[in-house]
Each structure stands twice: as structure tokens, then as C-alpha cells.
């Protein structure tokens, strides 16, 4: 039976799959994309009688495709922490779904594998801006601060690589980056040996240097909203910059609007770290989605921006 691995191109999706394939290697076909390219099941809608492993994309957003794939005799193993909606019922469907704000898909895989490759779950948790969870996992392994810091940087750099409107915006396609990880069961070996990581580190430094000169376009008691122009570096840095400003002001919500080539906006929302709730509720109102702590909108029309600002304030004003 053919194997197909479908995964979000961010650190969480890549590290979740890496853990599973270290445990159970397969000659799988890989299906992935940029961070926001999460309707990945549409790409394989004709698949029949295969084993699908799906990681870190919303089952709610992919529901129609998922139901069709189950009807076509595919066995589906699903690990995710985004808004799920109604969970399909099928003997072929094996869900591992937990939408709690302190977990990511790699933590769900870590649980499934009884912590066999926990170091990679720590990498993913840092990448997903779940620093408290990451430090708790690091504490369970008694990692020293230097090693924990290396895993933090690794997670944030892999995550940085996922953000863009298309693959052309990225330093590496997520498939290439995943394949670069595959020979390494130990993330510290990858950290010290990887040429890809050096390129990501340089790109990250350059892009963040530009982003840190930006000021909010709107600031209220609810939070801060930033707006970036239509340039590749703006798209690349959007996720890690959003995470950084969220950590700097943990009691505030944050949003970042990045202009797309068609004039609409790509929007990232971070709920306050001190109260990680409501991001997905806000974004669903604008045909977006995500999870309670962090969510997004793929195409916010310019005429909807003011309404988004008002809804943001309403959602996060205490």
C-alpha cells in the first residue's frame, strides 16, 4: 500500500513527520508547501487505497477532502492542534487531535511515541512560539541552558523558512529542508553540521533587522497591529516577527498584515501569551482559521481592514 506524508511546511509539521519517520521509516511521497498552504489534501484528492499521514493542518479546513479520501479507502493518521470542528467518524480515520493552546502537533507525536524523539518536539515547540511547553520538555530531559538555546534557535530558523506567499519566497522548499533533516536523529548534530542552517541564520538576521525598524500602525488597550509592504522579506519574516513582538508584550494581542501581490493582505494574529485564547475565533470571521493562541487570514480585502481592526479590539479588549 502506498504511503503519502502530508505536512505543514513549518517547524511543527517538519519535526512531527521527522519523529514519525525516525520511528517508522517509509518510502513516502511528500506533500507540503508554505506555512499558509494548508489545503494540502486537495492535491491528493484522487488517491485511493493508500496510507496517509497528515500533520499540522486543520481537519476543519480540509474536511471535504478528508471525507472524500476516507470514502476512497485510504487509511488516514492525523496529528493536529488547530481548530478541528466536527471530527469525522470512520474505521479508517485515526485522529490525534488536541486544540489546547499549550500543545503543537509535534508534542502530540511525542506523546504517541512515548517521548522517543523528544528533542525534536522541543525544536518544534520553540518554532511554534510555545516557549513554556518547550522549556518544560527540556526540563524533563535535564538539558542544560546552552543545549536548550540551540534547540530554540533551530526551531525558530526552521519556522522562519516556512513563511512566504509561494515557495519562491523561501530559502528552501519545506520538502528540501525535511530531507536535509532526515539523516539526523540528533538535532544537535544537525545544528552543528547543516549548511542549510547557516543560510537560514544569515537570512533571518537580515530580514529581522529590517522588520525591527517598523512601528505599529495601530495600538490600543487590546494590542498592537503592524502592516508590512509587498516584499519577499516581509513575507518571510512575518511569522517569527509576530512571535517576537508577542513575547515582548505578553499581555497584549498582536496582528501583522502583509500586503499580497493581488492587493489583499495576509494576516497573522497572536492572542496574548498571558491569555492564549481567541485568535482563531477572530480569524474565522474573515474566512481564516488556526488555533486559539495563533491564527491567520490568507486574503483580507483592503475594504475589510477597518472592520478587522474593530473586531480585533472587540475580541481582545479585557
Where are these regions (language model features)?
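Loop-centered beta-sheet repeat module
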Residues: 134, 138-185
Amino acid at each position: 500500500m502506498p504511503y503519502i506524508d502530508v505536512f505543514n511546511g513549518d517547524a511543527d509539521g517538519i519535526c512531527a513527520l521527522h519523529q514519525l519517520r525516525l520511528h517508522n521509516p517509509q518510502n513516502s511521497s511528500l506533500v507540503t508547501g508554505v506555512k499558509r498552504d494548508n489545503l494540502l489534501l486537495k492535491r491528493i484528492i484522487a488517491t485511493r487505497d493508500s496510507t496517509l499521514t497528515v500533520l499540522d493542518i486543520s481537519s476543519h479546513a480540509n474536511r471535504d477532502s478528508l471525507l472524500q479520501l476516507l470514502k476512497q479507502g485510504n487509511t488516514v493518521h492525523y496529528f493536529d492542534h488547530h481548530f478541528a470542528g466536527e471530527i469525522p467518524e470512520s474505521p479508517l480515520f485515526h485522529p490525534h487531535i488536541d486544540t489546547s493552546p499549550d500543545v503543537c502537533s509535534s508534542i502530540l507525536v511525542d506523546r504517541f511515541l512515548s517521548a522517543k524523539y523528544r528533542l525534536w518536539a522541543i525544536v518544534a515547540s520553540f518554532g511554534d512560539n510555545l516557549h513554556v511547553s518547550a522549556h518544560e520538555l527540556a526540563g524533563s530531559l535535564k538539558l542544560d541552558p546552552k543545549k536548550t538555546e540551540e534547540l530554540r534557535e533551530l526551531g525558530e530558523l526552521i519556522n522562519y523558512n516556512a513563511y512566504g506567499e509561494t515557495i519562491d519566497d523561501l530559502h528552501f522548499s519545506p520538502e528540501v529542508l525535511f530531507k536535509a533533516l532526515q539523516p539526523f536523529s540528533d538535532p544537535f548534530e544537525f545544528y552543528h553540521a547543516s549548511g542549510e542552517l547557516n543560510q537560514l541564520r544569515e537570512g533571518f538576521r537580515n530580514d529581522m533587522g529590517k522588520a525591527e525598524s517598523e512601528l505599529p500602525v495601530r495600538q490600543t488597550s487590546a494590542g498592537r497591529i503592524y502592516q508590512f509592504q509587498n516584499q519577499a522579506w516581509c513575507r518571510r519574516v512575518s511569522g517569527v516577527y509576530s512571535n517576537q513582538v508577542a513575547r515582548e508584550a505578553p499581555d497584549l494581542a498582536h496582528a501583522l498584515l502583509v500586503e499580497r501581490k493581488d492587493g489583499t493582505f495576509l494576516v497573522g494574529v497572536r492572542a496574548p501569551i498571558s491569555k492564549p485564547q481567541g485568535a482563531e475565533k477572530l480569524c474565522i470571521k474573515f474566512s481564516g482559521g488556526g488555533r486559539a493562541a495563533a491564527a491567520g487570514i490568507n486574503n483580507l480585502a483592503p475594504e475589510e481592514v477597518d472592520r478587522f481592526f474593530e473586531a480585533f479590539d472587540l475580541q481582545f479588549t479585557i
